[in-house]
Amino acid sequence: MRKGMLVIVPLKYTGGNMWLELMQHIKSTINNSGAAFNVMLGAMRPQAAKVDENGVIMVIRGETTRGDNSIQSYLEQELYIEVWGRNDNPDLEVGYELIANLEDRFEAIINDLRKRCGELDETACILQNTGYQIIDLVCTSKVGDHDSVRPLVGTQYRFMVRLIDLKEKTNGGIF
């Protein structure tokens, strides 16, 4: 190659619409849990989301990054999941009790999903349309809303979801 020559390298496939199917899968998992949350994809101001005491969950797309590809290539998908509730009681502690209850219900659903993915339950861990498998989902932070929009109370979770492409050819080995 001559010095100063421009080389165009094709981009490696980075998941396509995997992120959308993952978000839809999490929404479906929450909806099918019977927890009575109103679940939506995407973020909006909580004041516009018709939040009530049953709770609203917003599943929000974050960054998609490639992981360590030395053995099997995988992707990491960042998701933000916000849980919101409404309590009009002037006693602020009652609002904290509400959001604590909503957090407990949400976390039980996610813990069950994580457990089922660890057990390789295909209905829990395989994204059928894109062919990705959820290897793990880990909460990396949990932040309250600092009472910024009372009577609404909320919590934002940050998750990293690790996925592998089941369609990828590994040439029969780990190297």
Role assignments for model-derived ranges:
Residues 51-64:
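A short, hydrophobic beta-strand-centered structural micro-motif
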Residues 1-41, 45-48, 63-175:
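Charged, amphipathic alpha-helical segments and their flanking helix caps
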